[in-house]
Structures are given as structure tokens and as C-alpha cells.
Swiss-Prot record:
Annotated Mg(2+) binding sites: E42
Cleavable signal peptide: none
Binding locations of ITP: 12-17, 54, 70-71, 87, 146-149, 169, 174-175
Cofactor binding: number and manner: Binds 1 divalent metal cation per subunit; can use either Mg(2+) or Mn(2+).
Predominant subcellular localization, coarse grouping: cytoplasm
Coiled-coil positions: none
Class of this enzyme: hydrolase
GO cellular component, one term: cytoplasm
Cofactor annotation: Mg(2+); Mn(2+)
The protein, known as: Inosine triphosphate pyrophosphatase
Keywords, ordered alphabetically: Cytoplasm, Hydrolase, Magnesium, Manganese, Metal-binding, Nucleotide metabolism, Nucleotide-binding
Locations listed in the record: Cytoplasm
Length: 199
């Protein structure tokens, strides 16, 4: 599928995340994807509300179409914590600390959730796309250069995200599922979006 000249800014300064998103979207994504690092405030609240507000703020900064992503890692024994605050928890405690949070609990189950939010520009409607993968928290295994991937083992697999072949991971991951929903929306609304993004 040929790409239109319209570009969507994916707000991230994380090169690995950008690479993974580009791999998942593939050549069939109808719009050019650029990226930009914007220092958005660390918001508190429910994950979908955080994504919407980040998208609104990013669109105002970029003055055009944007995509933002918010990722949560939710421990069932802790009623969903760390949730959207996982980046802060990981920075402060490391992989061992994440495991230690569950040391007193027999339930190590967790789910990874990704919410992409998209808007065509400032003041326009914001669409959200939620992807979720169930799994469990395990001692870190595999490369440690991509967030909490080494401690999350998805249900039905013996490997952590960090140990998995990237193609397999992208096909079952929370991010892959969220982007699949986003792509379905873009396919359904392609003509309408092309007009809005060309304006």
C-alpha cells in the first residue's frame, strides 16, 4: 500500500520503542510516521485518561496529527499497581525490586497494557486503542535493555518478552494488540483521515 504524503508524529524519545512500533505497523501503514521527543508532564489517573490528556497536550505542541502511547504493567496481587507508574517503579527499584514487590504474595500474575491515543490535531476528537496481554512476573531473564521485558512472561510461553523472537513478541504483545486495533481504525477511516490530514 502506498503511503500518503501526510505524516503523523509519534511522540517518543525512545529509539527502541519507535523501532518496535515501526516493525509492528509494517509497510502497509498508509501514513508516514515521524517521531519527536516532547517532555510531557507525568500525569496521574486512570490509564485511558492519561493517554487522552497526553495526546491532547502533544497535539497542541506539534500543532498537527499525533500518536502517543502509555504502557502499564499491572500486578493482580497489588490491584493493578504499578500500572501506568511502571517506568518510575522500574527506575527506582530495578528488575529485582519489581519481583520483590510480589515477594509476600503467592499470586505472581500480571498483565501488560498498552494504550495508543491518536488525534488529527489540536481540538480534534481523540481515539484510544487498548491492547492487553496476560502473564506473570518472573526473575529477570534475557537482555535488560528494554524496560521491564525481562520480568514479564506472557501466558502460554516459557520465555520472557526479552527472550522472545521479536516477530513472535510483536504478534502477541500488548503493544502489538493496541496497534492492531489502531490499524483497523485507520483502514476503516482511511479516506476520511487522508482528507483531514491533508488539510
Amino acid at each position: 500500500m502506498a503511503k500518503t504524503t501526510a505524516a503523523i508524529t509519534f511522540v517518543t524519545g525512545n529509539a527502541k520503542k519507535l523501532q518496535e512500533v515501526q516493525q509492528i505497523l509494517g509497510q502497509g501503514f498508509p501514513f508516514e510516521l515521524t517521531n519527536r521527543k516532547i517532555d510531557l508532564p507525568e500525569l496521574q489517573g486512570e490509564p485511558e485518561d492519561i493517554s487522552r490528556e497526553k495526546c491532547r497536550l502533544a497535539a497542541a505542541e506539534v500543532k498537527g496529527p499525533v500518536m502517543v502511547e502509555d504502557t502499564s504493567l499491572c500486578f493482580n496481587a497489588l490491584h493493578g499497581l504499578p500500572g501506568p507508574y511502571i517506568k518510575w517503579f522500574l527506575d527506582k527499584t530495578g528488575h529485582v525490586g519489581l519481583n520483590n514487590l510480589l515477594a509476600a504474595y503467592p499470586d505472581k500474575s500480571a498483565y501488560a497494557q498498552c494504550i495508543f491515543a491518536f488525534t488529527t490535531g489540536p481540538g480534534a476528537e481523540i481515539q484510544t486503542f487498548v491492547g492487553r496481554t496476560e502473564g506473570k512476573i518472573v526473575p529477570a531473564r534475557g537482555p535488560t535493555d528494554f524496560g521491564w521485558d525481562p520480568v514479564f512472561q506472557p501466558d502460554g510461553f516459557e520465555e520472557t518478552y526479552a527472550e522472545m523472537d521479536k516477530t513472535i513478541k510483536n504478534s502477541i504483545s500488548h503493544r502489538g494488540r493496541s496497534l492492531s486495533a489502531l490499524c483497523a481504525y485507520f483502514d476503516t477511516h482511511k479516506a476520511e483521515l487522508e482528507k483531514q490530514l491533508a488539510a
